[in-house]
Curated annotation (Swiss-Prot):
Induction comment: By bmp4, probably acting indirectly via t/bra. Also induced to a lower extent by fgf and activin.
Protein's recorded name: Forkhead box protein F1-B
Region Disordered, annotated ranges: 1-51
Entries under InterPro entries matching the protein: Fork_head_dom, Forkhead_box_regulator, TF_fork_head_CS_1, TF_fork_head_CS_2, WH-like_DNA-bd_sf, WH_DNA-bd_sf
GO MF, one annotated term: DNA-binding transcription factor activity
DNA-binding region: 54-148
Tissues in which the protein is found: At the late gastrula stage, expressed in the presumptive ventrolateral mesoderm. During neurulation and tailbud stages, expressed in the lateral plate mesoderm and in the neural crest-derived structures of the head and branchial arches. During tailbud stages, expressed in the pronephros and pronephros ducts and in cells that migrate from the dorsolateral plate to the ventral region of the embryo (with the notable exception of the heart). These cells may represent hematopoietic or endothelial progenitor cells.
Entries under SUPFAM superfamilies matching the protein: Winged helix' DNA-binding domain
Species the sequence originates in: Xenopus laevis
Gene that encodes the chain: foxf1-b
Keyword annotations: Developmental protein, Differentiation, DNA-binding, Nucleus, Transcription, Transcription regulation
Length: 372
């Protein structure tokens, strides 16, 4: 009897899936993908970690700290980098933008000076030090900021300020000094006269020649009835107090101020005489007499008295010269009149309670240009 040997059923070969086949063909691919995913997880983990906090100092202060820490008080750019990295953890990280900030502050700020490199020193890199003129900014650890060019602008403006003060544009509040209760007004001889100021404004004229032929100042006070006529003249060369001694006549009662363009004498002796005649001078203006028929009548006359107290028979017709507004001369209306008021104090403020009148230089001028 033959024994049947039962063989175990042969197991079918395991069917390989397409993924497994791909895995067999590309054996290294799973490891590469796993490394990429691990790197992504690492980045996400590092993103949650904050970098060290920035030092509570400006870059100017940090650079000054680095330079002052050196015995020679000078450092190269790389040495400044090393000092900051060794001192503050913020500069040890992956962020490198702070180096640009250090370079910009060194080159753009005026308190840092780049020293020339010596001939015996090879390699590149200049030494940087602190400007001696700016050391006061960093005394006792005070790192105060200053705008770039602050001191240079101030030094550049100093000559202009001194020139403006030398011209005496602020002479109006300085030349008038009210002394006590008498109301005395003083006129210093060294004050800037009006003609010199106009000559400076003209620019093209020499200092000894007035642009419009003005060499003095005159103001005529005419009352409404023509009974009293006061005319005062004051030049920059005379420096006394000029007073009117008649305490009975009111100066400002219904008076009309009529400024005239005059050529006054440079020196004056003030006398209270009422019979002193007018002194006529030749005009200094280079006007053509033939082209301007009014030049002869417009040649002004100066009065060397402080105030002339005339009687009632001395009317305004006796005054030589043409008023500013004259009805009989139509050509005067065609001419343009330029009035320069360099004095803010009118003659109305010169009235004192005791009846003694002190008159000072009044700068109302009529500049009548020549009609060519």
């Amino acid at each position: 009897m033959t024994a049947e040997i039962q063989q175990p059923p042969s197991q079918p070969p395991a069917q390989s899936s397409p993924m497994s086949a791909a895995t067999d063909k590309h054996g290294g691919q799973p490891s590469a993908m796993e490394s990429a995913s691990c790197a992504t997880k690492t980045k996400k983990t590092n993103a949650g970690i904050r970098r060290p906090e920035k030092p509570p100092y400006s870059y100017i202060a940090l650079i000054v700290m680095a330079i002052q820490s050196s015995p020679t008080k000078r450092l190269t750019l790389s040495e400044i980098y090393q000092f900051l990295q060794s001192r503050f953890p913020f500069f040890r990280g992956s962020y490198q933008g702070w180096k640009n900030s250090v370079r910009h502050n060194l080159s753009l700020n005026e308190c840092f000076i780049k020293l020339p490199k010596g001939l015996g020193r090879p390699g590149k890199g200049h030494y940087w030090t602190i400007d001696p003129a700016s050391e006061f900014m960093f005394e006792e650890g005070s790192f105060r900021r200053r705008p770039r060019g602050f001191r240079r602008k101030c030094q550049a403006l100093k000559p202009m300020y001194s020139m403006m003060n030398g011209l005496g544009f602020n002479h109006i509040p300085d030349t008038y000094s009210f002394q006590g209760a008498s109301g005395t007004i003083s006129c210093p001889p060294n004050s800037l006269s009006l003609d010199s100021g106009i000559g400076m404004m003209n620019g093209h004229l020499p200092s000894n020649v007035d642009g419009m032929g003005l060499s003095g100042h005159s103001v005529s006070h005419l009352t409404a009835n023509g009974a009293h006529s006061y005319m005062g003249s004051c030049t920059g060369a005379s420096g006394g107090d000029y007073s009117h001694h008649d305490s009975g006549s009111p100066l400002l009662g219904g008076g009309v101020m009529d400024p005239h363009s005059v050529y006054s004498s440079p020196a004056s002796a003030w006398a209270p005489s009422a019979s002193t005649p007018y002194i006529k001078q030749q005009p200094l203006s280079p006007c053509n007499t033939a082209a301007n028929p009014l030049s002869s009548s417009l040649s002004s006359h100066s009065l060397d008295q402080s105030y002339l107290h005339q009687n009632s028979h001395n009317t305004a017709s006796e005054l030589q010269g043409i008023p500013r507004y004259h009805s009989q001369s139509p050509s005067m209306n065609d001419r343009k009149e330029f009035v320069f008021s360099f004095n803010a104090m009118a003659s109305s403020s010169m009235h004192s309670g005791s009846g003694s009148y002190y008159h000072q230089q009044v700068g109302y001028q009529d500049i009548k240009p020549c009609v060519m």
